[in-house]
Design a protein with these regions (language model features):
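Src homology 3 (SH3)-mediated interaction modules
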Residues: 1-58
Length: 58
């Protein structure tokens, strides 16, 4: 896992249950960084996909 900091807040689409929301400044653990959508885990254990351009690897 690689940590990434959120540059912006993101609200997951209600139409896509695989997306997760996060707030600016949150630190997510990146599980898979291939492609434009990364698989990430929040500190509460929630796992899902996030837009990579909203994050910066730490």
């Amino acid at each position: 896992l690689q940590p990434a900091g959120a540059l912006f807040s993101y609200k997951a689409s209600e139409d896509d249950p695989t997306e997760i929301s996060f707030a600016k400044g949150d630190v997510l653990q990146i599980v898979d960084s291939s492609g434009k959508w990364w698989q990430a885990q929040r500190s509460n254990g929630e796992l899902g996909i996030v837009p990579s351009n909203y994050l910066r690897l730490i």
